[in-house]
Amino acid sequence: MPRSLKKGPFIDLHLLKKVETAVEKSDRKPIKTWSRRSMILPNMVGLTIAVHNGRQHVPVHVSEEMVGHKLGEFAATRTYRGHAADKKAKR
């Protein structure tokens, strides 16, 4: 169920402050964050945000299409290694 429109988008205040200072200074260094739950806002477009996936920070370059999505959607937490190979097919 999506968030109510009257509440507005959620973003952690510490991340919002970092984004605003990066936009003011036109700083292109990646912004490190653990806040996967924060929504991507239009003023984040063009920035690189390093989102934590549980093990490391994954750099996410924000584009126009990402606005409205959450940061965690772009940093996968699980690695897919493929299904087990069919042993009969190898023979």
UniProtKB/Swiss-Prot annotation:
GO terms for molecular function: rRNA binding; structural constituent of ribosome. The gene is rpsS. HAMAP family: Ribosomal_uS19 (MF_00531). Protein S19 forms a complex with S13 that binds strongly to the 16S ribosomal RNA. The lineage of its organism: Bacteria, Pseudomonadati, Pseudomonadota, Gammaproteobacteria, Oceanospirillales. It comes from the Bacteria. Belongs to the universal ribosomal protein uS19 family. This is Small ribosomal subunit protein uS19. It comes from Chromohalobacter salexigens (strain ATCC BAA-138 / DSM 3043 / CIP 106854 / NCIMB 13768 / 1H11). One of its GO terms (biological process) is translation. Keywords: Ribonucleoprotein, Ribosomal protein, RNA-binding, rRNA-binding. GO terms for cellular component: cytoplasm; small ribosomal subunit.
